[in-house]
From Swiss-Prot:
This is Gene 42 protein. It comes from Mycobacterium phage D29 (Mycobacteriophage D29). The gene is 42.
């Protein structure tokens, strides 16, 4: 079982439905999300990104193996 993560900036430091939807979309591009659990964690500012508040979204996925 593979685990994927996506780090996204959080305007005003809040988790919104729009941000959660974007995270699900980004994770779905990497593979099929397995189960119905997505972990949400506070993340360090990624290198080269402006300061602010970031969330890291993690999910178990079944990766796409074919050509896209």
């Amino acid at each position: 079982m593979a685990q994927a993560n996506v780090v996204l900036p959080a305007p005003n430091g809040k988790l919104t439905e729009e941000l959660m939807g974007l995270a699900i979309h980004k994770l779905s591009q990497l593979g099929t999300i397995e189960g119905d659990e997505i972990g949400v964690y506070t993340a360090d500012v990624p290198e080269g990104r402006p300061p602010g508040f970031y969330f890291e979204f993690r999910a178990n996925i079944i990766p796409y193996l074919g050509r896209r």
